[in-house]
């Protein structure tokens, strides 16, 4: 023992010598207030990297060594310990703590005591069996249920681990590489880009315009720019904060539980909450439980007095032995409550979610939010990104125009002047964050933005070495790309002066230019060729190519302060056309969505023409569909927006704010919205949507953190699979609910009525007079319920755990996407489900009561004569009742596999091996239960012919189920509730919005409703008080219309008014000029204007159409 202590001491001393900086000291760097003094004491960046055995240029070594092992031993791993999960024994204790089960256990113990002593039992040698059997049944039910819960928890933990495992960019052994977030160590060099969530504490090494949002940590609302202390800047990077601008590198100083975020997360761990459906079903289970409790209490209030009254009427003395029957009645009542409480409902949800999530993960959907599994099935619209989701995100430059040439890539280096090549390649290399490195697949390739990777590959055609360019050019200032700016610029030192390189959306870059490079590489005024470049942009866009504009400008030192990007009067280098092939499976996936009643909208930053062509190729843009650009969309008023949304299919040149506005307004209109996003600024839209899908490959960490589901392959088809699984999970719950409620009603009713109608005294007299010596005639009629506590507990196990396992694991079928989505306000139990529940319950009760009251006569014809008569209410009689009851449930479980009017419950039957296994297991246990249970299960062995009869009786539920499903029934149309408060974030409309925001070309179809003849809004009226005859102009444009075309003043839709006219409540006055529609005011009248060319019209504020009076037109 002493030797081991000495060895441990030596190892600690060795680590202290190798890594002299303690964990506590490193932690002080990012504590509040931040440790500037500690940083200085450690020797700043160089001193700290030396003490941590790291190199700020080459990072940690790739080779394993004792130093690296000691590093992990001292500073820990970047992994938080798993939250303490509930062990199996704890789950068992939780299950046993149920008040109803405790009552049942207490009653069973009392039954054992009373049944095993002479004082209270006629047969003490066997009187204890019932109580012990109940205890064994309770243990089995609790054990199987708890084991199931334990396995579900393990599945969720496994998925959670997978969702947390991400890769970050770093430098090791002098090479840029991808590092698992769990493998990040103290001393690592990590690269940071806009949108990253910092994975560990660290200090700034170098970078440009790196700003972090630390508001959730320090309370500082403004972004904090990072740099070196000597520049009076903050060098400390805190784990959990977000990079909102710029890029850079950092030296890791703390990981895992020692990092700032690790300490915070360890203190904030809370248990996961139930999903909305779980909570809804828990409430339903409680209500059903109250019904069972009421039935049990009522049964006791009737049965116990009845027992004593019967004894008194027949002059039978009441003795101490009567305590045992009373206890059995109490046990029966408690068992009714146990059976009535459908604990399986929340269990079925958990099981369906666990099973569905595991299967979805295999199909490239990583679920981060459990509730989203339920919501996905109700999605009515999908707002999808284009790049990487609808397309393959495998980009390559295929054409373009530089210096007026470059139709193809062949011999391009010979077609473009050398000095222009130098400008072009310098700009593509330095104005980029992409780099060549080893990918997660082990391949050497460009890593980063796919657009930038395509440009770097294009630069290779000119012999460009991007590393040489980046070493040669010194960056002075960086102006990062943003979805709002649609461009990125970098300012570098160049020949004693400065040069700005800019790239971005081609039409935006072109608009910033004052000159261009001609075929010889000379600078010429842009006015000479602007029309040509615009034509080329449209040509490339018509071929579904992304167009990127490239430009530059030279500056003198001191020409401006460069705090704001000087992106004006640029020299236009040219345009490159980038091809991003459509994913081959997308058109079919879009068509599936249409059949499923889901509207697909494309929201993209590309220009309108490119977006239209891609959308048309996907099948998203259809005849009569609308396309619009983001800046125009955000200028629409709420009523105008509501008018175009039903037909809006493409939103081009959109910003994240436009996407958020679109999602919010769709939700306001009652839609269940799924949205995709990959950028940092997509976070609000992803959070706002009912289901947010982030990109697992191209998505930023901020987008992933804000999403509900991560698309591991960035593929639109995976969204369709997620919707399929969402519907399947919902259907699985409905199937189980349909099955369980039927069993509940039947079991409780049979136990309740059977107990109340049994006449023990008469049965005893009958049995004693029979005088037969065989085994059945020697038995006595049984007191109380025809279904004993042990039998009901077995039924409870069948209908709770086993049925949940069988029905919750049904695989999805294509038919799920052949119907409209379930409304988010749709009832959990539909009319067709009630039809099946009530119909099956009525059938089963009719059969069981027939067997209960006449079964001893009916089955007498099927047993050998040697058996003797079947005693009414005897052991054999009640065994037949119990066996028929179980077989009715087995066959009804097959019925429950289908919902609605579908006829064939055996379709895809063999596609679910779990269902088949459960059926075989249940059948096998039932045979053992009846044949060998004896006194423990209160059963008597049956003859083969009786088994056949029970199977035939149970199978009756199949044709009856078919007939029930054939009965037509109309489901009520559930209207989605329109929220009182809008979730959309509206920007203030421009005072002069373009007319194309509101009106399409003359051929467009109207898409909005006429004004109402009654209700909150009234139509305009003339001076005599009569309503004006109105007609409606169209709103929006079809896919083939040019929505940017202004409406000429000579349009036949425009009218003039010859005198003031009153306007009804709820209408607006709108002035139509030759170019614009302007809301004048909210007054009650409008008139002909003095100004020429101006016309007033009226518009319903809550309608999307314009109503123009036609009975007062100047001819």
Curated annotation (Swiss-Prot):
Catalytic residues (UniProt): 385 (4-aspartylphosphate intermediate)
Lumenal-side segments: 121-126, 257-287, 350-735, 854-873, 935-943
GO molecular function: ATP binding; ATP hydrolysis activity; calcium ion binding; calcium ion transmembrane transporter activity; P-type calcium transporter activity
Keywords, ordered alphabetically: ATP-binding, Calcium, Calcium transport, Cell membrane, Ion transport, Magnesium, Membrane, Metal-binding, Nucleotide-binding, Phosphoprotein, Translocase, Transmembrane, Transmembrane helix, Transport, Vacuole
Matching NCBIfam families: ATPase-IIB_Ca, ATPase_P-type
Further facts: Loss-of-function mutant (antisense inhibition) displays impaired growth in high Ca(2+) medium but normal growth in low Ca(2+) medium. Antisense inhibition does not affect development in high Ca(2+) medium.
Protein name: Calcium-transporting ATPase PAT1
Source organism of this protein record: Dictyostelium discoideum
Recorded name of the encoding gene: patA
């Amino acid at each position: 023992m002493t030797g081991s202590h000495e060895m441990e001491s030596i190892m600690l001393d060795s680590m202290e010598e190798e890594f002299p900086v303690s964990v506590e000291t490193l932690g002080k760097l990012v504590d509040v207030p931040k440790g500037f003094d500690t940083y200085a004491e450690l020797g700043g960046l160089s001193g700290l990297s030396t003490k941590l055995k790291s190199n700020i240029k080459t990072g940690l070594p790739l080779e394993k060594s004792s130093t690296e092992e000691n590093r992990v031993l001292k500073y820990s791993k970047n992994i938080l310990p798993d939250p303490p999960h509930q062990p199996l024994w704890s789950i068992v204790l939780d299950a046993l703590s149920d008040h109803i089960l405790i009552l049942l256990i207490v009653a069973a113990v009392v039954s054992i005591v009373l049944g095993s002593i002479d004082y209270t039992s006629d047969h003490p040698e066997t009187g204890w069996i019932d109580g012990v059997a109940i205890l064994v049944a309770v243990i089995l039910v609790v054990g199987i249920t708890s084991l199931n819960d334990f396995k579900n928890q393990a599945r969720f933990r496994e998925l959670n681990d997978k969702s947390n495992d991400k890769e970050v960019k770093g430098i090791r052994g002098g090479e840029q590489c991808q590092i698992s977030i769990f493998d990040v160590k103290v001393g690592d060099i990590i690269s940071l880009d806009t949108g990253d969530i910092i994975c560990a504490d660290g200090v700034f090494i170098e970078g440009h315009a790196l700003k972090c949002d630390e508001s959730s940590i320090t309370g500082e609302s403004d972004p904090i720019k990072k740099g070196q202390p000597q520049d009076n800047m903050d060098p400390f990077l805190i784990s959990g904060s977000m990079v909102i601008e710029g890029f850079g590198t950092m030296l890791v100083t703390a990981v895992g539980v020692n990092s700032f975020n690790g300490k915070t997360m360890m203190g904030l761990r809370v248990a996961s909450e139930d999903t909305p459906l779980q909570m809804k079903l828990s409430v339903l289970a409680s209500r059903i439980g109250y019904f069972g409790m009421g039935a049990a209490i009522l049964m006791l209030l009737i049965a116990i007095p009845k027992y004593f009254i019967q004894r008194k009427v027949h002059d039978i003395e009441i003795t101490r032995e009567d305590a045992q029957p009373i206890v059995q009645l109490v046990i029966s009542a408690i068992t009714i409550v146990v059976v009535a409480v459908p604990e399986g409902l929340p269990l079925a949800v958990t099981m369906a979610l666990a099973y569905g999530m595991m299967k979805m993960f295999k199909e490239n959907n990583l679920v981060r939010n459990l509730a989203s599994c339920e919501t996905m099935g109700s999605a009515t619209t999908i707002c999808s990104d284009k790049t990487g989701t609808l397309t393959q995100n495998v980009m390559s430059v295929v054409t373009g125009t530089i210096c007026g040439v470059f139709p193809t890539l062949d011999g391009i280096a010979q077609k473009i002047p050398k000095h222009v090549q130098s400008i072009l390649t310098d700009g593509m290399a330095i104005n980029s964050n992409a780099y060549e490195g080893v990918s997660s697949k082990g391949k050497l390739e460009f890593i980063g933005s796919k657009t930038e990777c395509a440009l770097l590959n294009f630069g290779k055609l000119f012999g460009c070495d991007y590393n040489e360019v980046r070493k040669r050019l010194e960056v002075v200032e960086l102006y990062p790309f943003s979805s709002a700016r649609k461009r990125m610029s970098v300012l570098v030192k160049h020949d004693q002066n400065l040069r700005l390189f800019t790239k971005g959306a081609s039409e935006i870059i072109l608009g910033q230019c004052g000159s261009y490079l001609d075929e010889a590489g000379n600078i010429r005024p842009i006015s000479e060729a602007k029309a040509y470049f615009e034509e080329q942009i449209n040509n490339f866009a018509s071929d579904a190519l992304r167009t990127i504009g490239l430009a530059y400008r030279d500056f003198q030192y001191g020409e401006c302060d460069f705090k704001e990007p000087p992106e004006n009067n640029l020299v236009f280098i040219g345009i490159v056309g980038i091809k991003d092939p459509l994913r081959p499976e997308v058109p079919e996936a879009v068509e599936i969505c249409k059949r499923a009643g889901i509207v697909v909208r494309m929201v993209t930053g590309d220009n309108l023409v490119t977006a239209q062509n891609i959308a048309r190729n996907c099948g998203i843009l259809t005849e009569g569909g609308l396309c619009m650009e983001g800046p125009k969309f955000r200028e629409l008023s709420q009523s105008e927006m509501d008018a175009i949304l039903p037909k809006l299919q493409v939103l081009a040149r959109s910003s994240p704010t436009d996407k958020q506005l679109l999602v919010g307004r769709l939700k306001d209109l009652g839609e269940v919205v799924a949205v995709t996003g990959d950028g940092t600024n997509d976070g609000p839209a992803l959070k706002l949507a009912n289901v947010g899908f982030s990109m697992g490959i191209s998505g930023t960490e901020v987008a992933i953190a804000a999403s509900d589901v991560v698309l591991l392959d960035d593929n639109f088809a995976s969204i369709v699979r997620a919707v399929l699984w969402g519907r399947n999970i919902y259907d699985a719950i409905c199937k189980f609910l349909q099955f369980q409620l039927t069993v509940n009603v039947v079991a409780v009713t049979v136990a309740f009525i059977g107990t109340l109608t049994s006449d023990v005294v008469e049965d005893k007299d009958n049995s004693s007079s029979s005088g037969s010596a065989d085994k059945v005639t020697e038995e006595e009629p049984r007191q109380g319920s025809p279904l004993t506590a042990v039998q009901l507990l077995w039924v409870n196990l069948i209908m709770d755990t086993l049925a949940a396992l069988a029905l919750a694991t049904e695989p999805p079928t294509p038919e799920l996407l052949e119907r409209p989505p379930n409304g988010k306000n749709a009832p959990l139990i539909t009319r067709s489900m009630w039809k099946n529940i009530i119909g099956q319950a009525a059938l089963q009760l009719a059969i069981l009561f027939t067997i209960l009251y006449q079964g001893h006569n009916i089955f007498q014809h099927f047993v050998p004569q040697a058996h003797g008569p079947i005693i009414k209410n005897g052991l054999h009689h009640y065994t037949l009742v119990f066996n028929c009851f179980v077989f009715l449930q087995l066959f009804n479980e097959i019925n429950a596999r289908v919902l609605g009017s579908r006829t064939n419950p055996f379709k895809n039957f063999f596609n679910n091996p779990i269902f088949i296994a459960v059926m075989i297991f249940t059948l096998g246990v039932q045979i053992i239960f009846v044949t060998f249970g004896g006194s423990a299960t209160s059963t008597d062995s049956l003859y083969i012919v009786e088994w056949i009869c029970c199977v035939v009786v149970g199978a009756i539920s199949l044709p009856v189920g078919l007939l029930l499903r054939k009965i037509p029934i109309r489901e009520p149309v559930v209207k989605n509730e329109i929220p009182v408060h809008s979730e959309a974030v509206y920007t203030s409309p421009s005072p002069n919005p373009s007319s194309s925001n509101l009106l399409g070309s003359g051929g467009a179809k109207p898409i909005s409703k006429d004004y109402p003849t009654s209700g909150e809004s009234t139509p305009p009226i003339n001076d005599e008080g009569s309503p004006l005859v109105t007609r409606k102009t169209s709103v929006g444009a079809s896919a083939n219309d040019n929505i940017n075309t202004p409406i000429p003043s000579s349009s036949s839709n425009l009218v003039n008014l010859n005198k003031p006219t009153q306007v009804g409540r709820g209408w607006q006055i709108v002035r139509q000029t030759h170019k614009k529609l302007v809301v004048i005011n909210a007054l009650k009248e409008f008139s002909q204007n003095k100004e020429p060319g101006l016309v007033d019209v009226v518009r319903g504020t809550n309608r999307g159409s314009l109503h123009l009076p036609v009975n007062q037109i100047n001819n």
